[in-house]
Amino acid sequence: MVSHEHSRAESGCCPLRAESVEWRLDKLSAQTVTDLALSINVSAVGIATIGWSGPVNAELLEGALRAAAEDLLAGRGLRRVEVSLPASDLSGRRAVLRAGFRLEGVRRQVLALPDGSYADIGLFSRLASDQVGGSHGFSSVMNSALPKKRLIAHVLMRDVQDRVVLCETQFKQDWELPGGIVEPLEPPRLGAVREVREELGLDLQVGRLLVVDWMPPYLGWDDAIEMIFEGGLVTDNDLASWSLQPTEIKAVGLVDLPTASELLTPLAFRRLSLAVGLGPDEMAYTEDGRTP
């Protein structure tokens, strides 16, 4: 139970001491409990920001944050509670996550350090609508904090001479296969179908998976996963009938492999060379376009 030192959310700053979290008193010494005080600032739009100072016991912090969040969200009718802490504070991070807060992002180099350098700060939150506890609540919290990778789905279309379809884009010098970045919660194959429709105006029945490639960090991008799907046979007449998305695609062409080597990045060409050489029932896994 949390004591209500201020009964109105609009009151601004309402200090909440950890000793009011009565269910923890039988697990931790009174001295440990009274050493932690949370400062809680509430905005006029129903958002509370929780902070504390100095190193704290992680188990105590978890319980205090959980109790404070439940009091603010359920007891006082707020809609959002926020916590910020240095990205290097792993113990605090675990406590915040275990208290049901979800990682929303990182504010880069905003915390001034004694040596004159700056550190990143992680932003965590709990909403009144968040499910907390149980399998779903645990998974949702962990999903917010675990690594995520970009997923790219491209399509390999060829003609009877084994020339491949490549696209010249509006945003970079090298060419690429039709396709693009898969949206969140979108299956990779359907992402490829959508991208081809958007870029080329083509409703394509995408076939089997040919290549899965891990791409290392490159030109400011983090690492990513690329999938290449079979797109079937096309002709020059097919290309002439496509409706190119003018903001993304300058041109498309059927090119042989020697020409492709001059248009693609070395990584993309390694991947393409492997894909076109696969047998009818073969699939390849590569790292940086190379078989491990």
Where are these regions (language model features)?
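Acidic, metal-coordinating catalytic segment for phosphate/diphosphate chemistry
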Residues: 117, 121-154
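Conserved catalytic-core motifs of GNAT/GCN5-like acyltransferases
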Residues: 84, 102-117
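Unchanged
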Residues: 135, 182-205, 213-268
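Conserved acetyl-CoA binding element of GNAT-fold acetyltransferases
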Residues: 38-56, 65-66, 175-180
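Conserved acetyl-CoA-binding loop-helix of GNAT-fold acetyltransferases
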Residues: 58-74, 94, 98, 188-193
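Conserved Nudix-box catalytic region and its N-terminal flanking loop in Nudix hydrolases
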Residues: 77-78, 85-94, 159-198
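Conserved N-terminal beta-strand and adjoining loop/helix that marks the start
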Residues: 31-40, 140-164, 181, 212
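Nudix hydrolase/Nudix homology domain
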Residues: 2, 82, 173-174, 246-292
